[in-house]
């Protein structure tokens, strides 16, 4: 039933219109590194792209696209993989790259994927359906590691209290369901007032980021885009929370020749020859009309860079303010 519900509910790509305006003219070959339900890929094709390569590590996303992808013939090619390797998926210099970060509405709406703290399902959260699940992490990580994950990846101030509660709960029985974990977290925090976010929001974000190695994937993906784009090619990134937006902002700032101001994770840094120019003075946020249509877009930010002809290079993740959590083992 969940799958049918998702098929009836149209996916709304966030900030699509301002993204297409910011990267215009849309032409040549583009790569959508987070294909999902295909909203950005279709938007790019309809805006004038000759060809789009859609990449996703979620096999369900590619399976669900099989019903309509053929309508575009050889203009749309789907690839199972991660955007951290997007340059290897491209095969030739690209005219543009689009990344829509974080968990998709499609994944949130399917309870069996285990991303939602509002729907009961197995505690999974894996985008690729491979490797360690959220249940594996929650039931085996040490209390100190859990606290670090919650604090650094979720900016959760009550991280130690929540980590302690998780360890105490799993001692009685393994934590295997999303609502069970959400209840454990909620008991550690004040009851939210009307309009405030669910108390488990930050904790679920943090665990999801850890399970999917989202920050290392993002840094490697930005580097891969730098390698793959031709001079004049566009990089457009849509973020949904402050941590990933900070990484993208700092990457574009440093790669455009600016100086990083530093933060609690990174020192001040001076960049080499500019690899990007910045056509937007600041990030673009959804307007009121888009928020009325899609409330989930509220935290979205769009940033755009235009590739120069300077050689691509490696970037120090710490220079981007990427939170690094030491491996402290299991319980």
From Swiss-Prot:
Ligand binding (S-adenosyl-L-methionine): 38-40, 56, 83, 100, 107
Chief location: cytoplasm
Gene Ontology terms for molecular function: rRNA (cytosine-N4-)-methyltransferase activity
Record key words, sorted: Cytoplasm, Methyltransferase, rRNA processing, S-adenosyl-L-methionine, Transferase
Record's subcellular location: Cytoplasm
GO CC annotations, alphabetized: cytoplasm
Reactions performed catalytically: cytidine(1402) in 16S rRNA + S-adenosyl-L-methionine = N(4)-methylcytidine(1402) in 16S rRNA + S-adenosyl-L-homocysteine + H(+)
Domain of life: Bacteria
Annotated EC: 2.1.1.199
PANTHER family named among the record's database cross-references: 12S RRNA N4-METHYLCYTIDINE METHYLTRANSFERASE, S-ADENOSYL-METHYLTRANSFERASE MRAW
Protein name from the UniProt record: Ribosomal RNA small subunit methyltransferase H
């Amino acid at each position: 039933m969940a799958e049918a519900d998702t098929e009836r509910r149209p996916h709304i790509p966030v900030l699509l219109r301002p993204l297409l305006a910011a990267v215009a003219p849309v032409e040549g070959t583009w790569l959508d590194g987070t294909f999902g339900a295909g909203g950005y890929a279709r938007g790019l094709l309809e805006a004038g792209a000759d060809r789009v390569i859609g990449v996703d590590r979620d096999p369900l996303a590619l399976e669900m696209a099989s019903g309509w992808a053929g309508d575009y013939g050889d203009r749309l090619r789907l690839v199972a993989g991660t955007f951290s390797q997007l340059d290897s998926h491209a095969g030739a210099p690209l005219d543009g790259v689009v990344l829509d970060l974080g968990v998709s509405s499609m994944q949130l709406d399917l309870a069996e994927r285990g991303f939602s703290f509002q729907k009961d399902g197995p505690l999974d959260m894996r985008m690729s359906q491979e490797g360690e699940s959220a249940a594996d992490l929650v039931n085996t990580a040490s209390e100190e590691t859990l606290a670090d994950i919650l604090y650094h990846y979720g900016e959760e101030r009550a991280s130690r209290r929540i980590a302690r509660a998780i360890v105490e709960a799993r001692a009685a029985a393994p934590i295997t369901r999303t609502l069970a974990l959400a209840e454990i977290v909620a008991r550690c925090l004040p009851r939210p007032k009307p309009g405030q976010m669910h108390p488990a929001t930050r904790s679920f974000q943090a665990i999801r980021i850890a399970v999917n190695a989202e920050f290392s994937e993002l840094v490697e993906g930005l580097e891969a885009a730098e390698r793959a784009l031709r001079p004049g090619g566009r990089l457009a990134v849509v973020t949904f929370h402050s941590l990933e937006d900070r990484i993208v902002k700092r990457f574009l700032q440093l790669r455009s020749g600016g100086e990083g101001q530093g933060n609690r994770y990174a020192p001040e840094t001076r960049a080499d020859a500019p690899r990007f120019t910045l056509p937007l003075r600041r990030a673009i946020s959804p307007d009121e009309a888009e928020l009325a249509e899609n409330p989930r877009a509220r935290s979205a930010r769009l940033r755009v860079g235009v590739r120069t002809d300077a050689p691509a290079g490696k970037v120090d993740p710490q220079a981007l303010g990427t939170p690094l959590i030491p491996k402290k083992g299991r319980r």
